[in-house]
């Protein structure tokens, strides 16, 4: 039985991925708090705060064959209402943590053996995201990091790549204050695992249905699309 490591797997899409993988892999979830549900036999949990200065915990998991990083958070708000501590914590958890974890597993990525690695980014990293400016900035940095590292991996002759998973809003998670609903996240989890296993480097859920047009509008006139995004968020009812 192969081993998989899910960072941020206690809820949302991370939990759904962990549960799907547990059907045929031994899975370890690393997160700040444990899942609120009882876990199958093949899933273990280790507590870790991604704001910790010591990431040595990941050196004890070098035997995994799959790494999926899903940890992250955001706050929908005007920038004037965002605290400086929120800015620091956002980059630490959303960006720096993922980069540090990849560094701990980089020898595995460079090696000749299959190592499946993916990171939850966001469509917000592909365009301006007013009222979500800090979150979008953390994800934009992560997007460029992944693209850059994938070029380095290719040029080194490695068969491995990092999968950038960049969805819009995902139903069935507690990201926007809702609750976990596996009925709404399981299908997406299966799709992500499929892209991981085929070593794709980018997966944008609902690309053809929604985001191809959105990205094209942004490319054509990023100012107008930014205003549209601002108005859409205000009308969404998610502003606190």
Give short role names for the model-derived ranges.
Residues 102, 138:
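Active-site helix of classical SDR
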Residues 10, 15-18:
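N-terminal Rossmann NAD(P)H-binding glycine-rich loop of SDR-like oxidoreductase domains
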Residues 122:
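Residue(s) in the substrate-gating loop at a strand-loop-helix junction
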Residues 160, 164, 177-217:
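C-terminal helical subdomain
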């Amino acid at each position: 039985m192969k081993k998989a490591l899910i960072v941020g797997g206690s809820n949302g899409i991370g939990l759904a991925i962990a549960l799907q993988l547990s059907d045929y892999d031994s899975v370890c979830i690393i997160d700040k708090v444990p899942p609120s549900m009882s876990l199958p036999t093949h899933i273990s949990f280790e507590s870790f705060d991604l704001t910790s200065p010591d990431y040595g915990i990941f050196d004890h998991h070098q035997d995994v064959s799959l790494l999926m990083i899903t940890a992250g958070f955001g706050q929908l708000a005007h920038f004037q209402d965002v605290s400086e501590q929120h800015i620091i914590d956002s980059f630490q958890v959303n960006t720096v943590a993922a980069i540090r974890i990849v560094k701990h597993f980089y020898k595995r990525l460079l090696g000749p053996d299959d190592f499946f690695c993916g990171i939850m980014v966001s469509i917000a990293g592909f365009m301006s995201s007013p009222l979500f400016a800090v979150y979008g900035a953390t994800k934009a940095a992560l997007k460029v990091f992944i693209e850059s590292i994938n070029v380095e991996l290719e040029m080194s002759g490695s068969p491995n790549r990092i999968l950038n998973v960049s969805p819009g809003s995902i139903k069935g998670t507690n990201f926007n204050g809702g609750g976990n609903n596996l009925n709404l996240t399981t299908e997406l989890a299966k799709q992500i695992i499929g892209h991981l296993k085929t070593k794709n480097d980018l997966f944008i859920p609902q690309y053809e249905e929604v985001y191809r047009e959105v990205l094209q509008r942004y490319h054509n006139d990023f100012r107008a699309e930014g205003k549209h995004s601002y108005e859409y968020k205000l009308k969404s009812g998610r502003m606190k």
